[in-house]
Regions:
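A short acidic (Asp/Glu
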Residues: 30-32, 100-103, 130-132
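C-terminal interaction surface of TIR/SEFIR-family domains
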Residues: 2-28, 43, 128-187
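Conserved beta-strand termini and adjacent loop/short-helix elements that scaffold enzyme active sites
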Residues: 55-59, 121, 158-160
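Conserved beta-strand-loop-alpha-helix hinge of the TIR/SEFIR fold
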Residues: 81-107, 116-125
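Conserved N-terminal substructure of TIR/SEFIR domains
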Residues: 1-84, 181-187
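Conserved beta-strand segments of alpha/beta enzyme cores
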Residues: 51-53, 117, 154
């Protein structure tokens, strides 16, 4: 894995907007880590609106409480939100379903249609290494594994910590053409 050099970014200012890829079913299940993670990210955004700009966090909460939405409407809304984003973030936990259709669909569209750099954050880790990827391999979405195998998407891997997330979201952007080096960049 290639490591990026430490970034010298402006703390307390992030103008980039981030699309959060998520598993709708997992967000609805209050016993799963995904709901707790979503609440953590929402809390960061409320406390530091100039540092975290998740374009779809309110929509995720809306979807979680409405299981009667029509698939075509949801996909249309996802496209509109992805179009506003500078990057895509995915949080991988021990509960992440690597085969979830909606999660893999979002990743595929964000990469193939909007060319968003992907930031994969591992919950519960303070540092990410090659061993982290091996440990979580069964929980990494199939689309991410496919991109790793083909080296066909620009992705970086970080621990889910406030500082690392802020720096990665503030640095990688489709609009500034700032991407991770390849599909296996550990940041």
């Amino acid at each position: 894995m290639r490591r990026n050099k430490p970034l010298k970014s402006k703390l307390n200012m992030n103008n980039h907007k981030t699309y959060l890829a998520f598993n709708v079913d997992a967000v609805r299940d209050s016993k799963m880590e995904n709901l707790h993670t979503l609440n953590l990210l929402g809390d960061w955004q409320k406390r530091y609106p100039n540092r975290f700009g998740f374009v779809n966090i309110d929509y995720i909460n809306f979807i979680a409480t409405h299981d009667d939405l029509v698939e075509t409407t949801v996909k249309s809304d996802f496209f509109a939100l992805m179009e506003k984003a500078d990057n895509l973030m995915l949080v991988v936990t021990k509960d992440t379903d690597a085969d979830n259709v909606w999660l893999n669909w979002q990743i595929s569209r964000a990469v193939n249609r909007y060319h968003l750099p992907v930031i994969v954050a591992f919950k519960g880790e303070s540092v990410v290494t090659d061993e982290t990827l091996k440990e979580y391999w069964n929980h990494i979405p199939q689309k991410i594994k496919k991109y790793i195998g083909r080296d066909s998407a620009r992705m970086c891997y970080i621990p889910l910590t406030e500082t690392k997330v802020e720096k990665a979201l503030g640095y990688f952007s489709v609009n500034t053409q700032t991407y991770p080096h390849n599909s296996t960049t550990i940041y």
